[in-house]
Amino acid sequence: MPHHYILTLFGLLPVATNISTWWNFGSMLLTCLALQVLTGFFLAVHYTANINLAFSSIIHITRDVPFGWMMQNLHAIGASMFFICIYIHIARGLYYGSYLNKETWMSGITLLITLMATAFFGYVLPWGQMSFWAATVITNLLTAVPYLGTSLTTWLWGGFAINDPTLTRFFALHFILPFAIISLSSLHIILLHEEGSSNPLGTNPDIDKIPFHPYHSHKDLLLLTLMMLSLLIIVSFFPDIFNDPDNFSKANPLVTPQHIKPEWYFLFAYGILRSIPNKLGGALALVMSIMILFTIPFTHTAHLRPMTFRPFSQLMFWTLVSTFITITWAATKPVEPPFIVISQVTSTLYFTFFLLIPILGWTENKMMNTL
């Protein structure tokens, strides 16, 4: 038995015996966070936050710094891996009703928002063509805020256009926000262990629990090993798989790319933004696409916690997953028919899922009562 308090805390943590592989993604996210902070530090040592030198400093890291290419690729592809894990983690929470642990869910969505902000600031730092124009388009959405919009945008940019002060403050924010993520992650874990994690059946797990270590810790190691193996294979053989070709050119404010788009993990929100022709409406839809996740614990009306035994909710859940993938795909395409209509239909379906949660719950309750 371990003698150290922290080791004892995790080693003797009582966990339900029947939690499946879908519960492994929390530990995978923790590993991703550690990897991002570590590689990010080594990159920050060699990076220069200046619009004339930023792009050159990335080239210097890749070419001249020992293993700089590996650090840079691990950091860039590690971010994609981070978002893959977090989207699966949220999907598991939606499917198995983990959101009913309200405090944990709220802290988790706050974590998601902080992570998205951090990733956005990081995407701007290489000062490539797509980095610059994605930053211009997204930050310009602040001008849609009534009365305060222009002042807010000028304050964020540090001037009347994206320039050196913008890059400096984005670098500062990208450096400091991971520490906020670490703090929020600690809070998230504390709140989770206060009530205990759910399980696939949605039953009270108190009657059948086992220590986290060695049973679940060894199970977690399998997916962790597979994730790290996948990451290293991509870094070694397909390092540019997630990169945009435009980002291999230095930012040029005088030349607009044919098709401006952010990283793939923001495309679902960008697709929703783009599907609404009004600027303020699009900005509100973009914010609501994330903020609507806060409402789920309060709209759950079903007697059963997970969707395991709720066929209508299962159908809606998998419709949401396919909708999410379709919006992401449509957002990579030009703004022209039929992609405009596809984006509008899928955006409507995305929000419809959250509106139907209470109605489906009541319907399923009535069905069970009649059996």
From Swiss-Prot:
Pfam families given in the database record: Cytochrom_B_C, Cytochrome_B
Keyword Iron: yes
Chain ranges passing through the membrane: 25-45, 69-90, 105-125, 170-190, 218-238, 280-300, 312-332, 339-358
Principal place of residence: mitochondrion
Binding of a ubiquinone, residues: H193
Signal peptide start and end residues: none
Cofactor remark: Binds 2 heme b groups non-covalently.
Residue sites binding heme b b562 per the record: H75, H174
Binding, heme b b566: H89, H188
Quaternary data: The cytochrome bc1 complex contains 3 respiratory subunits (MT-CYB, CYC1 and UQCRFS1), 2 core proteins (UQCRC1 and UQCRC2) and probably 6 low-molecular weight proteins.
Function in brief: Component of the ubiquinol-cytochrome c reductase complex (complex III or cytochrome b-c1 complex) that is part of the mitochondrial respiratory chain. The b-c1 complex mediates electron transfer from ubiquinol to cytochrome c. Contributes to the generation of a proton gradient across the mitochondrial membrane that is then used for ATP synthesis.
Name of the protein: Cytochrome b
Naturally occurring in which organism (per UniProt): Leiopython albertisii (Northern white-lipped python)
